[in-house]
Amino acid sequence: MSEERFVSGHRRPEDARIEETLRPQRLADYPGQERVKEQLSIYIAAAKKRGEPLDHVLLYGPPGLGKTTLAHIIAHEMGVNLRITSGPAISHQGDLAAILTQLSEGDVLFVDEIHRLNRLVEETLYPAMEDFALDIILGKGPAARTLRLDLPRFTLIGATTRYGALTSPLRDRFGVVLQLQFYSEEELTRILMRAARILNVPLDPGGAREIARRSRGTPRVANRLLRRLRDYAQVRADGVITRDVADAGLRMMGVDAMGLDTVDHKVLLTIIHHYGGGPVGLDTIAAATSEEPETIEDVYEPYLMQIGFLQRTPRGRVATRAAYEYLNIPYTDHPDEPEGPVQPRLF
């Protein structure tokens, strides 16, 4: 869709520049994700004591939760270089070979969207991950032979929003697998206050809490809303982002009290009004909302499920009683919806 979406967790070009400015360098300065940080701190300390590279790491979860930032921190804590690429950027085996042969001992290679690697490239990656070796096929047909090149020991960090899309052989080659969770309002409030100090944005605690409440548990969304509200406060208020200023600005941007925007409403209303609340298939929802099925599944559904507005069932997606109540629509019982009340709360 062409409509600007303030609450999407996907990175925009303008996000990258700000995120570089706000990015912490140490695990101790990284807010939230306490379980992930505790595990990583142990694994990093142990690897450094042994004088070895860190085991390969797989980070998965919705977009905007800090997977790239963690890759930067891991490289910094290990005292090594970081090389960044993405699954779609490695289109041929030669591309991967060029990247791997340029790594130094202990370096970190971060592959974003690793689920989008093509199969041939992925298979070339297996011996590199397991044996730190690269198999190159010379010649064709019966005369073809394989030349094995030794690689420096390195750490591969893969990031994905679609854990289930990874093949089992690839998943099994990661020694460390960590899932990133949505952030609490308290954690997002701390993130916003820190960002405001760095960016010199006048933000009071009430304004920070209001932004955090509507940021869908996602730091990237919170920081993006902070920047847009800075503009709103400078033009429509005295420059300070208070709770009232944040509320007015977010309403102007179409972000409601639960952090939902017009796209979220369209998804829910499509299920309710066009398909009787469900169950309805993913492709059908995508066609009705003019969105890609992968976008519905990766961007919209995780948050709608987290707050209890949407359920996945064997027969399709179902809008919950909580969604009906929030949208002020009379509820009709659905046999596919799990029994028991679902509260519209993030945490």
Curated annotation (Swiss-Prot):
Ranges for the region named Head domain (RuvB-H) are 257-347
Catalytic activity entry: ATP + H2O = ADP + phosphate + H(+)
Record EC number: 3.6.4.-
Enumerate the residues binding DNA: 312, 317
Q: Which UniProt keywords apply?
A: ATP-binding, Cytoplasm, DNA damage, DNA recombination, DNA repair, DNA-binding, Hydrolase, Nucleotide-binding
Spell out the CDD domains in the cross-references.
AAA
Indicate which residues the UniProt annotation says bind ATP: 22-23, 64, 67-69, 130-132, 173, 183, 220
Residue span of region Small ATPAse domain (RuvB-S): 184-254
What molecular function terms (GO) are annotated for this protein?
A: ATP binding; ATP hydrolysis activity; four-way junction DNA binding; four-way junction helicase activity
One GO term of the biological process aspect: DNA repair
Give residues annotated as binding Mg(2+): 68
Among SMART domains, the record links this protein to: AAA (SM00382)
InterPro entries attached to this UniProt entry? AAA+_ATPase (IPR003593), AAA_lid_4 (IPR041445), DNA_helicase_Holl-junc_RuvB (IPR004605), P-loop_NTPase (IPR027417), RuvB-like_N (IPR008824), RuvB_C (IPR008823), WH-like_DNA-bd_sf (IPR036388), WH_DNA-bd_sf (IPR036390)
User: Oligomeric state and partners?
Assistant: Homohexamer. Forms an RuvA(8)-RuvB(12)-Holliday junction (HJ) complex. HJ DNA is sandwiched between 2 RuvA tetramers; dsDNA enters through RuvA and exits via RuvB. An RuvB hexamer assembles on each DNA strand where it exits the tetramer. Each RuvB hexamer is contacted by two RuvA subunits (via domain III) on 2 adjacent RuvB subunits; this complex drives branch migration. In the full resolvosome a probable DNA-RuvA(4)-RuvB(12)-RuvC(2) complex forms which resolves the HJ.
What is the protein's known function? The RuvA-RuvB-RuvC complex processes Holliday junction (HJ) DNA during genetic recombination and DNA repair, while the RuvA-RuvB complex plays an important role in the rescue of blocked DNA replication forks via replication fork reversal (RFR). RuvA specifically binds to HJ cruciform DNA, conferring on it an open structure. The RuvB hexamer acts as an ATP-dependent pump, pulling dsDNA into and through the RuvAB complex. RuvB forms 2 homohexamers on either side of HJ DNA bound by 1 or 2 RuvA tetramers; 4 subunits per hexamer contact DNA at a time.
Q: Give the family from UniProt.
A: Belongs to the RuvB family.
The record's comment about this protein's domains reads: Has 3 domains, the large (RuvB-L) and small ATPase (RuvB-S) domains and the C-terminal head (RuvB-H) domain. The head domain binds DNA, while the ATPase domains jointly bind ATP, ADP or are empty depending on the state of the subunit in the translocation cycle. During a single DNA translocation step the structure of each domain remains the same, but their relative positions change.
Q: How is this protein named in the record?
A: Holliday junction branch migration complex subunit RuvB
Source organism per entry reads Symbiobacterium thermophilum (strain DSM 24528 / JCM 14929 / IAM 14863 / T)
Which lineage? Bacteria, Bacillati, Bacillota, Clostridia, Eubacteriales
